[in-house]
């Protein structure tokens, strides 16, 4: 039978373990940590085909920085005391080139129309005013994420004109029936054009579709807090008006066949389409 001191010691030990377990549960802990060794390797020099060679590579058609002005109004889920931080990212959902919708000189396109669509994704961190007492305002830091869409059309000037292919005019060959007993299985037998048979020729040229790359973006923004109201003597807001100037830089490319030749000077390679 355990004495009173032993029972008290076991109780204190169990209480300490329980408190220690709760502390780790609330604060977190390091599950595992290890130092990784260095793995040795061998540097390999890549091999390349000898020039001259014909390669199919992306060719830059145009590159442009486009300015897009956006104004948006949003209502947060709850009233906020102040905006703490706003993180922004830009995404494109459409970048379509109409290659022959611009200026054409001597049959060669000089400019084209570029249709852009996308959105600015904003993560807004704001502080609430849950407890207001005298000169102290306490609350929580919360966040919300929104997508502000934009769309525009711009004209790009070609650095290299795109390769285009048009459908040729259909060629039709009529056949002649020169005998009354022509075995063409037509309803009537007559001299002249063979009405129940003909030859057709279509010429279809397929080319690579131009595509875009988003190189970067700059955003200038003004956030105007609207519809203020007072709670416990402190001003809080319910609505946010955003004015943004978005500069996006896009590059338009097309896969084209390019002849790559060595230069005599040895300064690099020369490309010829």
Curated annotation (Swiss-Prot):
Pfam families referenced in this protein's UniProt entry, alphabetically: DUF7852
Cross-referenced InterPro entries: CsxC, DUF7852, Exosporium_prot_C
GO CC terms in record: exosporium
Domain of life: Bacteria
Disulfide bridge map: none
Designated gene of the protein: csxC
Entry's localization field: Spore wall
UniProt-recorded name of the protein: Exosporium protein C
